[in-house]
Amino acid sequence: MKKNNKLIDVPNINSSEARVKKLIYKVEDNLFNSLYKSSSKSEYLCICSGGTTSSCARDGLITLDLRKEYNQIHLEKERNLIKIGGGVIMKDLMNFLENHNKTFPIGLSKLTGAGYVLTGGISPLSRRYGLAIDNIESIKGYLGNGKFISLKKNNLNSDQKLIWEGLKGAAPFLAIITEIGLKTFQSYPIQIVEGFINDDELSMIINLAEEFPNNLSLQWIYAEGIYIYVFAEIKNDLDQEITKQYFKKFEKFTSLKIKNYENYNQINFFPKELELFELNKNNHSEVISLLGGDLKNNIQSFVKCMKEIIHDKPNRSCYVASQQLGGKIKEYDPKSSFFIHRKSTWKPWIYAAWKKNDTKERESVLNWMYESWEKLKIYFPKIHLAQIHNHLNSHEEEVYLSFGERLGELKTLKNICDPESILPPL
């Protein structure tokens, strides 16, 4: 059999080195026909919107790369609405919005694509503006059965309502999304307190953060050291006063510094210059994202647990980081989307990396990831399915912990929208 050399140029190293069966760039009718006739039921279509996940390309499978043909951006300024193609990366969206003094709650990375939005979308701005999916106004694309859809939030019939909810949080299992209409927001200045801290200081800062107003949020990384960002949006004089009061509490942490930014787009979180962890372009990696509520009286035991996890990490490239939820996110009806864990306060994620082609290290690193997840379950029992791991043994458990009591509905939706399972399996 002839060796297949088709490669896809994406940020994720696992995917960029996958020997894909075929690369396609546009959704056409014959795409669905050929997939329906596929002789192997283990085959499915991989979708690349930004290329930051390990599931956007797999050996021997077809990848649909949306970045070339679906990269349009159109702002309807009078409606505070922006329409983006399914292949637009967040960096391009934010650069475009910055030129119009607008913003959107993107995450800590600007490399992600529309998949970030469709799987939930947790941002430092989410405590004030909700998740990315909470700000979707319209969706266009193709269900797995080949049917074209054009849905508008305020014009849904009873049949479309469940599909709309499913696409907000579980789209990768149901459809190929080619356009999303998003609500945009006026851009405001940002103040950040950032710096390296120790274990005891992390405990104190998490305790402070669980009382934050909605314009503040905490993000941290625990790698070779601990680095934090306390993020504050300054919309008006009241924000300024509240932020000043809270930032005063951080003066006792002498390693922390205040930085000012004109807008959210100017911030670069966890830059490589800080050397927080070893960034190796020859590494393969996996990420698992957890969800849980306030830590409250468990903060110190959690930080102790984190210290043990980091002590046991198999190399300098692995780490654990976290974002803060809450605020506006909790106000939405859990049934408004398939991101059901609305009461969550924290989203930690475990980043596990190993040298490519080193099967022994891969096994060791994945064992560390699963053992760390097991230790953290007591604090963060749920999952945010930001990456699909149907190539790993944990996939079914991740799906269950992500969709919970709505998993039955999702399976029904899957049977309706993607009966031949041409998209990733549940």
Regions found by a protein language model. Name each.
Residues 1-426:
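Soluble FAD-dependent oxygen oxidases
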